[in-house]
Amino acid sequence: MGTLASELGGYAEQVSGQPRVYVDANVPAGLVSFMRQALHWDVLFVLEHDELRRAPDGEHYRLARQLRRTLITQDRDYLDDRKFPPEQSGGVLVLWAPVEKGLMVLLKRVDREVLRRNALPQTAVDEIAETPLPLEGRKLHVHIDWDGERIAP
């Protein structure tokens, strides 16, 4: 098995410059498709990887940071700063809406107001490790009443 960069090859070049997210098993597959097709995000979805399907939350938290991805979930446990210290993350986005369409509306706002607000131009694959993540070291809980303000570190 090679390195992650060598295994992804050309795909990594296609999605560089796009928001890079790590989506846990609590997020519906339809929403993952929306992230990829409508928002053009670079998505690692744990349910598509047998070795990650049953990993504990702490492992997902660690892997998201190691892979330089913002963790996206519907699991509010990630908001517990004692269990998941913000400074040890690449950023956490916790979503909540009663229906999937509401989640899509929230993701469009997050894409526009948070992830792409200060977006850098397309980044070379080798520079991904040096590019700061939009929510690095912070957590954001978005829901239908979200006023657009970020949760401070």
Predicted segments with their positions:
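Short, conserved beta-strand edge motifs with alternating hydrophobic and charged residues
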Residues: 24, 44-47, 72-75
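Conserved BB-loop
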Residues: 42-57
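Short active-site oxyanion
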Residues: 17-21, 65-70
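Short aromatic/hydrophobic-glycine micro-motifs
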Residues: 40-41, 69
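Acidic, PIN/NYN-like endoribonuclease modules and their adjacent C-terminal/linker elements
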Residues: 2-14, 19, 24-25, 29-40, ...
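Acidic, metal-binding active-site segment of PIN/NYN-like and related structure-specific nucleases
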Residues: 68-83
